[in-house]
From Swiss-Prot:
Single GO molecular function: double-stranded DNA binding
Binding annotation for [2Fe-2S] cluster: C91, C96, C102
NCBIfam families: PRK11014.1, rrf2_super
Protein's recorded name: HTH-type transcriptional repressor NsrR
Domain of life: Bacteria
Free-text cofactor note: Binds 1 [2Fe-2S] cluster per subunit.
DNA-binding region: 28-51
GO aspect biological process, one term: negative regulation of DNA-templated transcription
GO cellular component: cytosol
């Protein structure tokens, strides 16, 4: 299963925000610079993550973005469910005439469930905790 770029960069943005000291603000421009993604695309992603409560957006001259909740409360499976269209194939009878007898849709549904179940085992914190190489790649201070 391949995630859309929206979900992919949404997760990456959350990873970056999780590396900031608690409460510290950064800019969308900084996140786009780190990942080399279009600012317009990242604005849409941050807007959605803000609506979902994962990102806190602060307006004004001294504004910016930061995590909207602690990283240990952000479950990866929840983020993917909220940002990813999870229909793997179109099994409507109007689209596929074998749908009434097809066993593939059940197998794919099980695979999707297993994929999400694995993501549910991990939080945003688990991606950054004790991961100095990640901090180096994100140009964040490494704490011993």
């Amino acid at each position: 299963m391949q995630l859309t770029s929206f979900t992919d960069y949404g997760l990456r943005a959350l990873i970056y925000l999780a590396t900031l000291p608690e409460g510290e603000l950064t800019s969308i421009s900084k996140v786009t610079e780190v990942y080399g993604v279009s600012r317009n695309h990242m604005v849409k992603i941050i807007n959605k993550l803000g609506q979902l409560g994962y990102v806190d957006t602060v307006r004004g001259k001294n504004g910016g973005i930061r995590l909207g909740m602690p990283a240990n409360r952000i479950i990866l499976g929840d983020v993917v469910r909220a940002t990813e269209p999870l229909q793997i194939v179109n099994c409507s009878e109007d689209f596929c005439h074998i749908t009434p007898a097809c066993q593939l849709k059940g197998i794919l549904a099980s695979a999707r469930s297993a994929f999400l179940a694995e993501l549910d085992k991990h939080t945003l914190l688990s991606l950054i905790d004790n991961n100095p190489p990640l901090l180096v790649l994100l140009d964040r201070p490494v704490t011993e």
